């Protein structure tokens, strides 16, 4: 995520890991000088290095206060965690908190590629126009798409629930 952000812009601000108050201070400082430009707060739903997770509702509340959008990368837990496989967004009942959700098909779904889900129409249009070169150069093959679909059907089934429960019991 950090490398992608650096490739996109030099205007990046960091705050302490899982530190909602630190994020609030950072956004307050940014908004003191800039009330117009968009701010994108990026987090993972599950940080793989230490298996910790942010409070998505708290992040969303701070984002709303400072007119920022919240992007949640659920690559590490989507399909693998929670009774329904919705990861920490589901466990925290926070599916409606993220403005943008991104994820990977290379983990739970055993393929390559990924997805992006966008709530805001303006952000959707922005991505449509400014990501066109990526869209047409990295399309999933029909076999990869079928593999993802088959894996998703397992994730959403009773078999998927049983497998996730068994996995959690083994930890």
Question: For the regions a protein language model found, what residue spans apply to each?
Answer:
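Active-site C-terminal subdomain of aminotransferase-like
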Residues: 66-69, 76, 81-171
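Conserved PLP-anchoring active-site segment centered on the Schiff-base-forming lysine
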Residues: 1, 24, 168-170
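Short beta->alpha connector loops at strand-helix junctions that form conserved
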Residues: 14-18, 138
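Substrate-binding/gating loop at the entrance of the active-site cleft, primarily
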Residues: 1-9
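Conserved beta-strand scaffold positions in the cores of enzyme catalytic domains, especially
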Residues: 11-14, 101
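Catalytic P-loop NTPase motifs of RecA-like helicase/translocase cores
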Residues: 1, 49, 72, 77-79
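Active-site phosphate-binding strand-loop segment of PLP-dependent enzymes
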Residues: 17-71
